[in-house]
Regions:
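Extracellular beta-strand-rich, repetitive "passenger/adhesive" scaffolds
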Residues: 1-201
Length: 201
């Protein structure tokens, strides 16, 4: 539902420097791999179904809420879209995302991870979705699906929303972990800092 300014459909591509995308235009790796030697600056969605290596920072300007989720025209409601989709198929671990920089990842929509995420940075998520028919019947900011892995080097802040860590999945962060409503863990969960429930939207 978004225009795409940078896409890898198959094969591999490498960019030695930084990348800046126009507002409202996504980054899309359908298969294959994309390596970026610097920062990525954007105000839209990251779709990664292959291998994406960002050696610098992933800077998503979440103040530009008109563009920040995958659902065009419905962006005033954070529940209508996600800001990061890593992989596509539950249980297959079909994508890999590496972020080398230490600037916090900031996502206005929610986050879906079917694959592996390795980030030296922390992560803040403001959006949420509902998971009807699942173990979580509440607002969920981050879904780490079955067999998925997610590592964050710093603090993870999910605002006042829930976290779902699926069967055999792995989650860890190098700082504090803040969530709301509930954390459901069916896999492995570790936080190096404090674990705190945030009741403030």
């Amino acid at each position: 539902n978004r225009g795409v300014s940078l896409a890898v459909i198959s094969g591999s591509a490498n960019i030695s420097g930084s990348v800046t995308l126009p507002d409202g235009n996504a980054l899309f790796v359908k298969s294959g791999s994309l390596g970026i030697g610097g920062d990525v600056n954007m105000a839209c969605v990251v779709y990664n179904y292959g291998k994406l290596y960002i050696l610098g920072n992933l800077n998503v300007d979440w103040s530009k809420t008109k563009y920040i989720s995958d659902r065009d025209g419905e962006d005033n409601d954070m529940r209508t879209g996600y800001s990061l989709k890593n992989g596509q198929t539950i249980g297959t671990v079909d994508a890999y995302l590496y972020i080398g920089g230490t600037n916090d990842l900031k996502f206005y929509g929610y986050v879906q991870n079917f694959g592996e995420i390795y980030s030296n940075a922390g992560m803040r998520v403001r959006g949420w979705c509902n998971m009807p028919g699942s173990a979580i019947m509440s607002d969920t900011a981050f879904i780490n699906f079955k067999n998925a892995k997610a590592h964050f080097g710093g603090t993870v802040d999910l605002n006042s929303n829930a976290f779902y860590n699926g069967e055999n999945s792995v989650f860890d962060c190098g700082g504090d972990y803040t969530y709301g409503i509930v954390t459901i863990n069916l896999g492995s969960f570790a936080a190096a800092g404090n674990v705190e429930m945030n009741k403030i939207n």
